[in-house]
Amino acid sequence: KPEICFSFYNEKIFIDLINEIKNLQFEGYSLFIDEKGIIIIGCDEAGLYYGVVSLMQIVKGSLLNEKKNLIKKCKIIDYPDLKYRYYHESPGWGRKKEEKEKVVKWYKEYIKNFVAGQKFNMLCFNIDNQFTFSNPDLNTKAFITKDQYLEIAEFCKDHFIEFIPSLETGGHFNWVPKNKFPQFFEDGFTRQANVSHPHFYKFIFPVMQELIPEGCKYFNICHDEWWASPSADVTDKLNGIPRKEIFLKYVLDQYKWLREKGIRPMMYGDMLLKNHNGDDPGARKGLYEITKLLPNDIIIINWSSGVDPDSNKFFHNLGFEVICASNGFRPCVSDRNIVSGFGMLCYGFSFLMSGIVNDDFTLNYGYTSLLRTADYAWNIKNDTGFPVQEFERNKGKNVCAIGSVKPNPHRSSAFQIISLRKYVNSNLKDITGAELKISSAKNQFGFIPMEILKPKENEEKSLIVLNSEEKPIDIEINEPFSSIYFLHGCYIPKEKREEFFKQSSNFIWGVPIATYTFVYEDNTWERTEARFGLNILDISPPNLRSRYMSDIRYFWEGENDKEQPAFLYQYEWVNPNPNKKIKKIILQKTDTEAIAIIFAITARNVRWEEK
């Protein structure tokens, strides 16, 4: 734990800093760095935590500059503008076929780096058929146990994040197997719950109870998109009862059930708005009229601001706290003084990262949208609401680099270029039809010395291509290193691109297109993967914005000889066993349509502790 050491500083410095922050809002902090040391003072425990988060961002930024690993003097006084900084995850992991055993480990890393690490303070976890319920008939796709779920919830608590259970119990009821529970589905709809069934409450409330961890403060009851895609004969009444009364009764009954447990409900606002989903002809007619009858201590998650620009004001004027959270980044500049929170609905796409499901749509949910949302939620009062694209142009490259820095306590300042001369097997023109306009020689890439070979000086071979026609490539090393840097990219034939994107339905954390296996002198090994959208991408991506990825230390940008933009991506693997000699690196393709291409490899030496 941090300690105050007055031998380093004059007591007046502490008193001045404390006086400067004592009137700050909750979660504020002061960070002071000079040649003597570092002081972090938090308004509360969360503020102290965010001060450390900012310090680590500064440290990581300094570590990227190999020529000048210095932390500059600074004084920061900072606090969030909003009470709620909301990150909503609807993990579609139950549909994934691979790597399920790594989900909890990866998700905890994700929370630390991308949720808490970007100073979100709410994580709404919209889990349904991925959860292992006590009722076995619900578990057709389950793979997260209750213990694992509670482990994630506790991890959030440790990182000052409110963990919010969320369950779709109305309009998106298709997580429940219809063949097992047909009585709880309303006729005329594919996914609508029949909440007026006499036994529905006996079914749904025990299910909700299983998702509530100890100390839970909020529960998102959702209620978006009720009665969607009705058959032609559906009216605004069900069994003679107005549907708006059915909807109101159900929300109020859930509200009462949660409040008796000391839990505050949250819900989406689209069904409560005349100009969004609350007044369509047929089943939804007049639904919005119930809004004024709801308790205004329900927190409204408003994803409707793009459809109804006045929706934040509408809810605010009725006394509701409003969290403006949309599909991707959608600023609410005119409402900055009335919303209580801001956030993003991610649906598992941002976990997959950049451009992984297709080349355009999922960028709305990708890495830079996540970063921009976090920045806006913290600084909304003075933020002009500039778009994600502007954020990418001005800050994307540096922010992505900072996020990629990994702990490496044995890092040395010395490097060794691993010569690929004996291993190269092709050139870029033979693979893609175009060659890069890049100086082939030893150069600095993100302050790391790397060597790209000249094809003409090496029998027209300058890189390692991993495709279905090639055997694994074994690169001899026989030295200990603290980390290894890869300068790589990939190529996906145009006619195979659509098929490649289908792989995203199998994997949780990017699609692995190649494996890099490190074999030690004792024949034990470690492995990392080149994961599309995470640390590797097309050399010439169809959507250039995809290049901003979460696990690339640096990207080279230029063009090929066809005047097309081109990029190479630098990825660092940190060796967990720096005391062992790495005998060899095995490079191997995975079973996808993508072709991984390695241009250069550099190793960082080990800094041995003095004895």
Name each region found by the language model:
Residues K22-M266, R547:
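Feature activates predominantly on carbohydrate-active enzymes
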Residues E392-K611:
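N-terminal/edge-of-domain interface segments
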Residues E45, G92, I127-Q130, S166-G170, ...:
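An acidic- and aromatic-residue-enriched active-site/binding cleft used to recognize and process polar
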Residues K1-A46, S54, I58-I77, M267-I290, ...:
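Acidic, contiguous N-terminal accessory segments
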Residues A46-G61, S354, L363-Y376, L487-Y491:
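Short, hydrophobic/amphipathic alpha-helical patches that form generic packing surfaces
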Residues L31, E66-K73, R85, K108, ...:
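Substrate-binding groove of N-acetylhexosamine-processing glycoside hydrolases
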Residues L17, S311-F315, G355-D360, R497, ...:
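Short conserved micro-motifs at the rims of enzyme active sites and ligand-binding pockets
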Residues R95-K96, Q130-S134, G170-N174, W227-P230, ...:
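Flexible loop/turn segments at secondary-structure boundaries
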